[in-house]
């Protein structure tokens, strides 16, 4: 199972406006706040769908952005997904400006990734989940059939 969705209605106001999001990777699921400062819910849904489509059509890596303020913000968050054959390996990632070398590339945020790592610089194992390309294709199909955004 692979799924990314937005839950409920926006909460907060101004630059603290957000909506809850959820990712499902096999049996794992995580809920997170999705800021609505610069991007609207439809922007996230469109980015997720576009990234998933690129992945199932052969892209070796994509990033599903889940925390986007503006390209020059203090940080961004997303879920990089590396395709290895029929398997997709997914990690959560914090993108910091000093690691990006400039504003984040919204069209192709994966350009900021580098190779997939399983051990952090501190020597700790990086959490990683495995789904299949078929799981990601099913996500695309569900989103294409649904009139409800992510």
Task: List the predicted regions and their residue ranges.
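N-terminal low-complexity, intrinsically disordered segments
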Residues: 1-75, 83
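Short, hydrophobic/proline-enriched secondary-structure or compact coil segments at domain edges
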Residues: 20-23, 88-92
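Short, surface-exposed linear patches
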Residues: 45-46, 86-88, 102-104, 112
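Short, surface-exposed, polar/charged, turn-prone segments marking secondary-structure boundaries
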Residues: 50-52, 90-93, 118-119
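Intrinsically disordered, flexible peripheral segments
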Residues: 80-85, 90-91, 97-98
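Mixed-charge, glycine-accented linear interaction segment located at domain edges/termini
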Residues: 94-150
């Amino acid at each position: 199972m692979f799924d990314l969705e937005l839950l409920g209605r926006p909460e907060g106001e101004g630059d603290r406006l957000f909506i809850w999001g959820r990712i499902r990777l096999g049996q794992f699921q995580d809920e997170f706040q999705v800021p609505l400062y610069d991007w609207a819910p439809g922007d996230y849904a469109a980015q997720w769908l576009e990234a998933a489509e690129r992945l199932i059509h052969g892209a070796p890596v994509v990033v599903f952005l889940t925390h986007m303020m503006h390209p020059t913000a203090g940080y961004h968050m997303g879920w990089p997904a590396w395709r290895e054959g029929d398997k997709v390996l997914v990690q959560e990632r914090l993108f910091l400006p000093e690691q990006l070398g400039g504003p984040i590339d919204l069209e192709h945020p994966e350009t900021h990734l580098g190779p997939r790592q399983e051990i952090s610089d501190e020597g700790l194992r990086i959490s990683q989940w495995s789904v299949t390309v078929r799981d990601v294709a099913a996500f695309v199909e569900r989103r294409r059939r649904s009139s409800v955004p992510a």
